[in-house]
């Protein structure tokens, strides 16, 4: 989210190096001993341009949330309590009438159904050489950009630091 700087990325990389050294000194077996989500050999490489799957699950029907007023949202991040007053809540229905019961709700559902990695990404993001494993949240995209179909890129500097930390660890 907004606020990450190269200073934060440097701290993350330095800390990942320290913990990597510890893991390696202890000779931990990542297959059997434990799991640390910071390290993943499958991430930090280009994504196939044909892979259009969006990282975020909040653009479909897999993360439905409901507020106390009975409004239905694609995810909790679209609710008023998550938007920090930066956007209007992005509901797609209500408990009395169902999902997609108005033209506005239908329009929002159609918008989200069309979101994929290509539509939400700039060319720099889409063709990033370490795109695999880069996460995003369409609700946060909506909060800062006014649309769920425009990827916020504040996390880039931290993803790069994590990639460097993985390079250090795995090599």
Each language-model region and where it sits:
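Radical SAM enzyme [4Fe-4S]-AdoMet core and its adjacent flexible, acidic
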Residues: 1-72, 79-90, 151
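Short glycine-/small-residue motifs
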Residues: 74-75, 136
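Flexible mid-to-C-terminal extensions adjoining Fe-S/redox cofactors in radical SAM and related proteins
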Residues: 80-171
